[in-house]
Amino acid sequence: MKYFLDSAKIDEIRYAYKYLKIDGITTNPNHIKNSGKSFNTICKELAAEFKDIYFPISIEIDPHLDKAEDMIREGRKYAAMSSNFVIKIACTEQGLIAAEQLEKEGIKTNITLVFSVSQAIQAARIHSTYVSPFIGWKENNGEDGISYLKEIKDIYEKYDYQTEIIAAAVRNGRQIGKLASYGIHITTAGLAVYQESLNHPFTSYGIQKFCRAWEETKQDD
């Protein structure tokens, strides 16, 4: 399983790339806002940061756009900034039309805001490079946010779809483990989620227990 970082903060990205070995980045308008920088500034920083390596970076176009031709135009604009940029487009009819055209032009796309199996099927049928089904938002709404990703994965394998699944809005290590057991290609989460997934109360308990044993053990002079 690949780990993508869901962030637009360059310091977080550098840290996660160096120490957590992330394989890519996903951004969205909320992350751009939280970075305190403009959209264009973030795009330029990310393009420069990874200019010498292949490193997929999902850049979400203006969500106000609701016509395919406008989405295509903006997708081309940002794809021209870096060969690493993947154009992130919401799963609407017009968005899927735009993504299909961009893929035909060799521009990679990521269909986002996916909440159903049928949406994910169409994303694969138009040959989007990635599809991003959301987990956390569905679970916050009282729905099962995990099992439908297994359905998507099974359907993709059955019909030999090549679109890679990015599990989005991942909230904890339990979800990461379950997604890995399903064979989901990629998970994307914030830095804190990955860091917290490395912790366990028994690990902390064990360290404390062994520290006490160490201190109580007679040491050679």
PLM regions and their residue ranges:
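Active-site beta->alpha loop and helix N-cap motifs at the rims of alpha/beta catalytic domains
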Residues: 2-14, 19-22, 27-94, 98-101, ...
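Glycine-enriched alpha-helix->loop->beta-strand junction motifs that scaffold or abut catalytic
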Residues: 19-24, 81-84, 101-110, 125-132, ...
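Glycine-rich phosphate-binding active-site loops on the catalytic face of alpha/beta enzymes
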Residues: 29-33, 113, 129-141, 183-203
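Catalytic cores of alpha/beta
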Residues: 11-19, 70-74, 98, 116-126, ...
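Glycine- and other small-residue-rich loops at beta-strand/loop junctions that grip anionic moieties
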Residues: 5, 59-60, 88-91, 112, ...
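Conserved, mostly hydrophobic/aromatic
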Residues: 28, 87, 123, 179, ...
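Alpha-helix-loop-beta-strand connector modules within alpha/beta enzyme cores
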Residues: 40-58, 79-80, 96-109, 146-165, ...
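C-terminal alpha-helical cap/extension of soluble enzyme domains
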Residues: 156-221
